[in-house]
């Protein structure tokens, strides 16, 4: 099974939103048994907490389930266990590469790296900006392109 880990700073806004949206997209394409998704945060401040209320509100409005999602911190083991590690911004990438040390990091990329015509490289953090709508649109586009890339690469 192909595995995808979405990573943001605290695992309550962007990465759980991406996990939920990606799962929904994969399910709609009949890929539930072929691709699994998870999310984690660089920091451990929110471990055990559900997604931020702003993330929950957007996902509810979109009709996308986030049942059972609780924040967790990314681990070194995750770097080995996941085929794709998808970070939300350059700071997350730096933290993940530092954690990896001398291990291969070619499977660690930013979500918006998959969006060819994006003016942005990073998904902004709505925890600080409150712009959950904009972030949701960026994440949706990124997840659609990521899934298409995985389907092409893995011939799904």
UniProtKB/Swiss-Prot annotation:
SUPFAM superfamilies: Phosphotyrosine protein phosphatases I. Optimum pH is 6.0. Its EC number is 3.1.3.48. SMART domains: LMWPc. Gene3D superfamilies: 3.40.50.2300. One of its GO terms (molecular function) is protein tyrosine phosphatase activity. Induction: By ethanol stress. Expression is sigma B-dependent. It catalyses: O-phospho-L-tyrosyl-[protein] + H2O = L-tyrosyl-[protein] + phosphate. It is an enzyme of class 3 (hydrolase). The active site is at residues 8, 14, 125. Changing residue 8 to S: Completely abolishes the tyrosine-phosphatase activity. Dephosphorylates the phosphotyrosine-containing proteins. Involved in ethanol stress resistance. Belongs to the low molecular weight phosphotyrosine protein phosphatase family. This is Low molecular weight protein-tyrosine-phosphatase YfkJ.
């Amino acid at each position: 099974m192909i595995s995808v880990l979405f990573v943001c700073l605290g695992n309550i806004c962007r990465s759980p939103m991406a996990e939920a949206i990606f799962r929904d997209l994969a399910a709609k394409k009949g890929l539930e048994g072929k691709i699994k998704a998870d999310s984690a945060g660089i920091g451990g401040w929110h471990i055990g907490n559900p997604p931020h209320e702003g993330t929950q509100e957007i996902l509810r409005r979109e009709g996308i389930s986030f049942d059972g999602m609780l924040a967790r911190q990314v681990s070194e083991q995750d770097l080995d266990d996941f085929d794709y590690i998808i970070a939300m911004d350059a700071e997350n990438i730096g933290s993940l590469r530092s954690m990896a040390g001398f291990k291969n990091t070619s499977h660690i990329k930013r979500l918006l790296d998959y969006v060819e015509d994006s003016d942005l490289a990073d998904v902004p953090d709505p925890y600080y900006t409150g712009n959950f709508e904009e972030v949701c649109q960026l994440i949706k586009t990124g997840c659609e392109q990521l899934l298409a890339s995985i389907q092409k690469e893995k011939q799904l």
